[in-house]
Amino acid sequence: MNLEVKKIDTANARLSAKPSIENLEKRYDKIAQKIAQKVKIDGFRRGKVPLSLVKTRYQAQIEQDAQEEMIQEVLKNAFKELGIENKDLIGSPNLTKFEKKDTHFEIEADIGLKPTIVLDKIKECVPSVGVEIPNEEKINERLKQLAKDYAKFVDTDAQRKAQNDDKLTIDFEGFIDNAPFEGGKAENFNLILGSKQMLEDFEKALLGMQAGEEKEFPLIFPSGYHAEHLAGKEALFKVKLHQIQVREALEINDELAKIVLANEENATLKLLKERVEGQLFLENKARLYNEELKEKLIENLDEKIVFDLPKTIIEQEMDLLFRNALYSMQAEEVKSLQESQEKAKEKRESFRNDATKSVKITFIIDALAKEEKIGVHDNEVFQTLYYEAMMTGQNPENLIEQYRKNNMLAAVKMAMIEDRVLAYLLDKNLPKEQQEILEKMRPNAQKTQAG
């Protein structure tokens, strides 16, 4: 077969082979026989179709199957010479050359191998961490917000004019070009003015209305509105206000603590303050990590953890980044790239550094996650996407299905694992007293979030 293999480094190998034409042709009869057992041709019983007829009718398929079989044999022999197995591979080998000559084929392929990653310098990569401890002023602000959020809405006098923070019960219907539109109508709809639950201009139009009042007003949907069929269009809304309710103020005392910490025995204002302080600490930590330290940690990992990267995976990542970039390009730029192979190649090459860094960090994170037994369940991925859908006004099931169809669920899971691994490394580098705050707060992290 005239096979040559070369181990370039610990993560890359290359093969070159020249199998003969006979090597391919000897496979034809066996493949044709397999096809003959399955196909149905008029005038012949299944399995009784003459081989000559099968070869004529299915020539292209036989040729393709024979080539694939021959390539797999080449790869199998190459793996044997390299002393590797399928479990050592990362991704599929990349066929870079397949040419038919007079007497043989010329085949070349790049083989990506799972890299060897040494994590002995991880501690050097983690930046120093110091989270701001919430002061009394911040704690009191959050207590006031909790008192507001947990306050009940009660009826008010009929003469009251609607103000921000009032709870309104309304009927509304929207029209575009005198015709109602999908999603533009609701009855007995509850809305807290100023909450940005609806478009800002919609809520502003309700200010000053009284119970029983009806009103019509124009509204232009923003050009970037999530419902594309409404984006940039002018609508006329008809609204009837049924009821106005106001918050019944709560005192900041032990009674408030019992409401907020309903699952705690003997909840007191002192305990609530401790919980609020811990929650604010977690929020400060998340802000510091997301805005500064995670990126710094990634840069350090990229710089200090050195190992060979499989070229095949970098090339795949470059393709992905290039394709994604096309979606955000102007039509003229896309056309320019389509018309010039050289420009397209140059543009794709511009993503090499980003692709290399992305692949490297992914391998490091994967190794750390396995070492520290950090993972993400599929249900957590679905919960994350469900929350994203709710925040962007999309149908959760449709969004999840969209991610599934585009094979993006694995990428979401990997991003979540990366976030957890980075947070884990940074948490370990917190001062001892802050680690104690964090440990104390873990079971209670969700209890005192405002809203």
From Swiss-Prot:
It is found in: Cytoplasm. SUPFAM superfamilies: FKBP-like (SSF54534), Triger factor/SurA peptide-binding domain-like (SSF109998), Trigger factor ribosome-binding domain (SSF102735). It catalyses: [protein]-peptidylproline (omega=180) = [protein]-peptidylproline (omega=0). PROSITE patterns: FKBP_PPIASE. It comes from the Bacteria. InterPro entries: PPIase_dom_sf (IPR046357), PPIase_FKBP_dom (IPR001179), Trig_fac (IPR005215), Trigger_fac_C (IPR008880), Trigger_fac_C_sf (IPR037041), Trigger_fac_ribosome-bd_bac (IPR008881), Trigger_fac_ribosome-bd_sf (IPR036611), Trigger_fact/SurA_dom_sf (IPR027304). Its EC number is 5.2.1.8. Pfam families: FKBP_C, Trigger_C, Trigger_N. One of its GO terms (cellular component) is cytoplasm. GO terms for molecular function: peptidyl-prolyl cis-trans isomerase activity; protein folding chaperone; ribosome binding. Residues 165-250 form the PPIase FKBP-type domain. The keyword Chaperone applies. GO terms for biological process: 'de novo' cotranslational protein folding; cell division; chaperone-mediated protein folding; protein transport; protein unfolding. Keywords: Cell cycle, Cell division, Chaperone, Cytoplasm, Isomerase, Rotamase. Belongs to the FKBP-type PPIase family. Tig subfamily. Involved in protein export. Acts as a chaperone by maintaining the newly synthesized protein in an open conformation. Functions as a peptidyl-prolyl cis-trans isomerase. Consists of 3 domains; the N-terminus binds the ribosome, the middle domain has PPIase activity, while the C-terminus has intrinsic chaperone activity on its own. This is Trigger factor. It comes from Helicobacter pylori (strain P12).
